[in-house]
């Protein structure tokens, strides 16, 4: 499958329905329960969105819907679902995390074409969170490679959002150095030399900060 990378500064949220939700599709039951398996930083988003969806669904069908949330590193969540974690919906950070679930035979081929925008309902801009008052005057990627700056970011090996962080840094360096790969790699190396903690997910990185 051709990879459809969005922007290097965007977080792909791929969405796929898993299994059969008879109650949802036929509206026969008074209530229905669904589980959304998602990546780390979306917890608060869905806590708010679920209330809107529950109201909408009640008005549309007369059904009450109970939504259970599961959160963690995107790759880890995909592996959990592939290995048996029951999910009705997955909202993950990377296309190939959903592909891993497809490869396990839990969703049909072609999921990426099922909804508009390659099944990417939203994007998330990368921002820098700094100490109060921004004492080191951090404004752009160049500031993160200064020797007196410590960086906290999730591990790209376990976190989908961290991979977008990595790609955003790469895109910045590619533009800055006109595609000179040696200089790009040097920039990325200097950035990760400043990383104090590589947590497994975005929530852990926020806690460490």
Predicted features along the sequence, with ranges:
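Alpha-helix N-cap recognition
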Residues: 72, 140, 200-201
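A conserved helix-loop-strand patch within extracytoplasmic ligand-binding domains
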Residues: 102-175
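Short, low-complexity disordered leader/linker segments with a strong preference
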Residues: 1-33, 55
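Second-shell loop/turn segments in exported
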Residues: 32-38, 80, 151-159, 192-196
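Ligand-binding pocket segment of bilobal, Venus flytrap-like solute-binding proteins
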Residues: 177-209
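Sec/Tat-exported extracytoplasmic proteins
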Residues: 49, 53-61, 85, 94, ...
């Amino acid at each position: 499958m051709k990879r459809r990378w969005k922007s290097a500064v965007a977080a792909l949220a791929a969405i796929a329905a898993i299994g059969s939700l008879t109650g949802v599709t036929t509206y026969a039951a008074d209530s229905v329960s669904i589980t959304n398996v998602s990546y780390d930083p979306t917890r608060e988003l869905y806590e708010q969105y679920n209330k809107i969806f529950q109201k909408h669904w009640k008005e549309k069908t007369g059904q009450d819907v109970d939504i259970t949330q599961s959160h963690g590193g995107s790759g880890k969540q995909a592996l959990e679902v592939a290995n048996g974690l029951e999910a009705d919906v997955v909202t993950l950070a990377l296309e190939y995390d959903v592909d891993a679930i497809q490869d396990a035979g839990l969703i049909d081929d072609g999921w990426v074409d099922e909804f508009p925008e390659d099944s990417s309902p939203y994007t998330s801009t990368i921002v820098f969170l700094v100490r109060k008052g921004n004492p080191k005057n951090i404004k752009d990627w160049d500031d993160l490679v200064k020797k007196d700056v410590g960086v906290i970011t999730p591990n790209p090996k376990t976190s989908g959002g961290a991979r977008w962080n990595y790609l955003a840094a790469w895109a910045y360096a590619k533009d800055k150095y006109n595609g000179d790969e040696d200089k790009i790699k040097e920039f990325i190396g200097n950035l990760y030399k400043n990383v104090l903690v590589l947590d497994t997910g975005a929530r852990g990185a926020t806690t460490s900060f």
